[in-house]
Regions:
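Short loop/edge segments at beta-strand edges and connector loops
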Residues: 83, 102-104, 263
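Glycine-rich FAD pyrophosphate-binding loop
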Residues: 1-14
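C-terminal helical "tail/cap" subdomain of flavin- and related membrane-associated enzymes
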Residues: 324-414
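FAD/FMN-dependent oxidoreductases across multiple families
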Residues: 226-228, 232-325, 331
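Predominantly flavin-linked oxidoreductase catalytic cores and closely associated redox partners
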Residues: 88-256
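N-terminal FAD cofactor-binding segment of flavoenzymes
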Residues: 11-53
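Short beta-strand to alpha-helix junction loop
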Residues: 64-87, 178, 230-237
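Helix-loop-beta segment of a Rossmann-like dinucleotide-binding subdomain
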Residues: 55-79, 122, 217-226
Length: 414
């Protein structure tokens, strides 16, 4: 049974970039051909900009990526991408004798006490929400999978039962997005996406991601804890900060002079990062995401990359991992606590290294002087650009950045 709160197609607030890691899972699900038959933007490079005005364009060469079994990535509205994924998801569910319910609000997670503790056995809710007056329905299952985003009711119950925190503002990011048409220097069917670390947005970043035609996803992301630390003269909403950047910033106001805001596209949201928690009461990283009877995937398991902000790839990986840990015969009386622990350990085993590396990169980008210096150096030294391309393609390559020999050879030497 697939239960969905919204009626599809629906908007999803996001940066709209779909990286190569995500596309490999999309291809496996049989959706890639569908995406490629619809309008989309091919990402061939990433432009990184620093506060002092330096920029470096890191190429994502298609041929090199294909040799590694990867794709450089696409950018397209999540309403479009998600609808195709949901369409395929419905087909798979129905082909296997299941059902799909849209517009269903989960009001309660059903929990039973057991000899070993607690077990989630299902959900209760109704179509249209509590105020609709519609009759409540209860569904039970050997396994309940929570995929409801940063505030997923399944993930909240899992952490509450174990008396562990669900939210940590040091690992939650606020995001704000708008769509603009005709931003200077961007558009077409293929080209760069842009990420800028500028004074007015640090310790967050400002992005420009073309999606199709002349339309561009424009947004800001910043850790919620860092946003709260801003001094009074800078403590504005992300919406107001973005408005200033677009209208007043010397590097961007000319680019937006003839651009048009798409009415109704101004929306904010939150991203639960998968960065490791220090001194956490939970024995699992980044937080507890499963228990007897239930697992969480994607944002509900707090798996968003803390540097890039991308969550699709890790969401799809966690969903695939969930399927491999559930055995309908072995778990016919309920998904066990032992299986839940194995899932969480294997999940962190698969993602922990890259999420930890990304957290380190996120922290480095807070240091304005270092970011200015690095981007300026990279813009003049081809070797650094090639290294950054490899880092984007392979998270394992990020480890090279922290090698003392690499720092001396690549950055310090002329």
């Amino acid at each position: 049974l697939l239960i969905e709160k919204e009626i599809w197609p629906r908007d999803k607030i996001c940066g709209d970039a779909v990286g190569g890691k995500s596309l490999s899972h999309v291809k496996e699900l049989g959706v890639l051909d569908m995406i490629e038959s619809t309008p989309h933007y091919v990402v061939d490079s990433i432009v990184f900009g620093s506060a002092n005005g330096s920029e470096v364009r890191v190429m994502l060469p298609k041929e090199s990526y294909e040799k590694m079994g990867l794709q450089s990535g696409y950018s397209l509205p999540r309403m479009q991408f998600d609808y195709m994924m949901f369409k395929r998801g419905q087909e798979i569910v129905r082909e296997n004798g299941g059902s799909v319910i849209q517009g269903f609000s989960v009001n309660e997670i059903t929990v039973e006490k057991t000899e070993k503790g607690h077990k989630i056995t299902g959900i209760t809710g109704n179509i249209g929400g509590k105020r609709s007056g519609n009759e409540n329905m209860t569904f039970t299952s050997a396994l309940t999978i929570g995929a409801g985003g940063y505030n997923c009711p399944v993930s909240r119950v899992i952490t509450e039962i174990h008396n562990e925190p669900h939210r940590d503002d040091d690992h939650f990011c606020g995001g704000y997005r708008e769509y603009w048409d005709n931003v200077e220097g961007l558009g077409g069917e293929e080209g760069p996406i842009e990420i800028h670390f500028i004074d007015e947005v640090l310790p967050g970043y400002f992005w420009l991601f073309p999606v199709q035609g002349n339309r561009v996803n424009v947004g800001i992301g910043m850790l919620i804890s860092e946003h709260r630390k801003l001094k009074a003269d800078r403590k504005k909403s992300l919406k107001k900060i973005q408005k200033w950047v677009i209208n007043e910033h010397p590097r961007f106001k000319k680019r937006f002079a003839n651009a048009t805001l798409v009415s109704g596209s101004e929306k904010g949201w939150q991203l639960p990062f998968g960065s490791p928690r220090k001194n956490s009461p939970s024995p699992f990283q980044p937080r507890r995401a499963a228990m007897a009877g239930a697992v969480c995937v994607g944002d509900a398991a707090s798996l968003v990359d803390p540097f890039s902000g991308e969550g699709i790839g890790n969401a799809l990986l966690s969903a695939k991992l969930t399927a491999s840990h559930f055995d309908k015969d072995l778990h016919k009386d309920g998904f066990t606590e032992e299986a839940a622990i194995e899932y969480m350990n294997n999940l962190w085993g698969a993602l922990g290294s890259e999420l930890t590396n990304s957290k380190t990169l996120q922290k480095v980008m807070k240091w304005k002087l270092l970011t200015n210096w690095f981007v300026k150096k990279a813009s003049k030294k081809e070797e650094i650009g090639k290294m950054m391309s490899e880092m984007i393609a392979s998270k394992e390559s990020q480890k090279i950045l922290w090698s003392p020999w690499f720092l001396m050879k690549t950055l310090l030497l002329p």
